[in-house]
């Protein structure tokens, strides 16, 4: 009778490359594409078709000799708000899972950043393509403007892309920072956070009013233009992203 001796192989202690760890977090965040992709596109499509149908009915009721201005609809703005919600849900739900699967806090923050950039670029490109079709068809044949505004109607496509990209990144960073506060300090942290935010907003508006600086603010916005003013949002985006990292690096997954 012979016996077989089994020798256990030592476990590899070589750490995974950073890119691999980041990709793992990104795959985790995209695990349910309905949340970040399918649902917002479905809602956007339904809202667009409803607006187009309503505007077509209104236009059909105008006499042939009547005039009708191009309608500008803000329905597409819901997409930016929805991405803020996606950011909040992603951080709240995926952060403890990522740590449970062996990812570090840095891996999660970097992975979330890649996740946000991918969605921001993708949705910005979609809005640009839709706006180009909208222009080419004269507002979908009925003078209806859903994917663009009067300010961007004459702008170059890359300006619309840059503006959308900046807006998406801003909303993602705000959502991540807000969610990180809840992850670390729960309800009490949210009370303090929103209280401080309201206080800062009212205080800032009061300061500008006391200095009679509103005309200067308006002049600056007019001078910078839509895209130039939006570029300043990068400061807020960077601050929120940094805040999310500083908060999450000390956060735990326990209640």
Regions found by a protein language model. Give the residues of each.
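Alpha-helical transmembrane segments of multipass membrane proteins
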Residues: 43, 47-51, 119-127, 171, ...
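Hydrophobic alpha-helical transmembrane segments
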Residues: 1-67, 207-255
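Long, hydrophobic alpha-helical segments
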Residues: 71-91
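Secretory targeting signals
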Residues: 51-73, 116-185
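Selective transmembrane-helix segments that form parts of the transport pathway or gating/packing helices
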Residues: 34-44, 109-132
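Helix-loop-helix units of permease transmembrane domains in multi-pass membrane transporters
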Residues: 91-117
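Transmembrane alpha-helical segments in integral membrane proteins
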Residues: 86-97, 166-189, 239-250
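Central hydrophobic cores of alpha-helical transmembrane segments
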Residues: 190-200
């Amino acid at each position: 009778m012979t016996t077989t001796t089994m020798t256990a192989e030592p476990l590899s202690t070589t750490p995974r490359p950073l890119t691999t760890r980041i990709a793992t977090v990104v795959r985790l965040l995209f695990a349910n594409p309905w949340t970040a992709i399918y649902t917002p596109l479905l809602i956007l499509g339904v809202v667009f078709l409803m607006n187009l149908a309503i505007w077509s009915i209104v236009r059909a009721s105008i006499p042939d000799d009547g005039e009708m201005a191009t309608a500008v609809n803000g329905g597409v703005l819901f997409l930016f708000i929805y991405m803020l919600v996606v950011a909040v849900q992603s951080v709240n739900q995926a952060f403890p899972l990522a740590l449970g699967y062996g990812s570090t806090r840095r891996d999660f923050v970097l992975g979330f950043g890649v996740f946000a950039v991918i969605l921001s670029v993708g949705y910005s490109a979609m809005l640009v393509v839709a706006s180009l079709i909208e222009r080419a068809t004269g507002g979908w044949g009925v003078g209806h403007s859903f994917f663009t505004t009067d300010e961007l109607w004459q702008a170059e496509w890359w300006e619309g892309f840059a503006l959308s990209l900046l807006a998406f990144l801003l909303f993602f960073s705000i959502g991540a920072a807000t969610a990180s506060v809840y992850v670390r300090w729960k309800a009490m942290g949210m009370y303090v956070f929103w209280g401080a935010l309201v206080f800062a907003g009212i205080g800032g508006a009061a300061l500008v009013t006391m200095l009679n600086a509103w005309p200067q603010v308006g002049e600056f916005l007019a001078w910078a233009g839509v895209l130039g003013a939006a570029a300043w949002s990068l400061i807020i985006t960077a601050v929120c992203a940094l805040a999310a990292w500083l908060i999450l690096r000390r956060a735990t997954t326990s209640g």
